[in-house]
A protein has these predicted regions:
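Primarily the internal scaffold of c-type cytochrome electron-transfer domains
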Residues: 1-205
Length: 205
């Protein structure tokens, strides 16, 4: 109860509460009225083989916190509650509207670098609207099943880099669907489309 009250009074980052339930870590200290901060209470697992792939993508069932904390979104100030209702955990908006609330021409004043253009057309996702591959999460938050029936989306929310997958052996979002192809094929297709559209080359991963 004091945890919720402390959050309500503005003395605690909401994500400190969330990460404790949605991460893979060991407990360092028991929760007390003076110990709320995530890193004061927990020791998160590091990005190591068996838990994460070489490029940081989830491998073992590491839940969401570790992936999200390494994301550009988290570094820019995005919090769990920007996308999810903090009480029920459900998305605040349906489908791609979760992403286009910021990644759109109108954008969100808190995250100016996310807006300024539309990402909803086939010129961005290269797939027929409404079909597999056209949703933001298909490419930027690929899902993996754990224990057969437990799908989890990778919350690192990364830009697909099949060129890196070809070198590191990490999963490639494209060939997760195009299973008869290789990451090298994906990289060549993306490079061809990038040049045709005049899009800047991807920066460091």
């Amino acid at each position: 109860e004091f945890g919720v009250g402390s959050h309500r009074n503005g003395t605690l980052d909401h994500d400190d509460l969330v990460f404790g339930n949605h991460g893979f870590q060991s407990v360092e200290r028991v929760l007390t009225p003076t110990v709320f901060a995530f890193l004061d209470r927990y020791r998160p697992e590091t990005l190591r083989p068996g838990l994460y792939h070489a490029d940081g993508q989830q491998d073992g069932e590491v839940f969401e916190a570790g992936s999200f904390r390494q994301s550009r979104m988290h570094a820019a100030g995005v919090r769990c509650s920007d996308c999810h209702d903090p009480h029920g955990g459900k998305l605040r908006r349906p489908g791609d509207a979760t992403c286009t609330a910021c990644h759109s021409p109108a954008g969100d004043a808190r995250f100016p670098s996310a807006g300024g253009r539309s990402y909803e057309g086939t010129d961005h996702h290269f797939h027929a609207s409404g079909k597999a591959g056209s949703r933001c999460v298909d490419c930027h938050m690929p899902s993996r099943n754990y224990m057969v029936v437990h799908p989890r989306r990778d919350h690192a929310i990364r830009i697909p880099r099949p060129d890196l997958s070809a070198r590191t052996g990490a999963p490639d979002a494209c060939t997760a669907c195009h299973a008869d192809r290789t990451p090298a094929w994906s990289a060549a297709v993306l490079e061809e489309r990038r040049k045709a559209s005049g899009t800047a080359a991807p920066g460091p991963h």
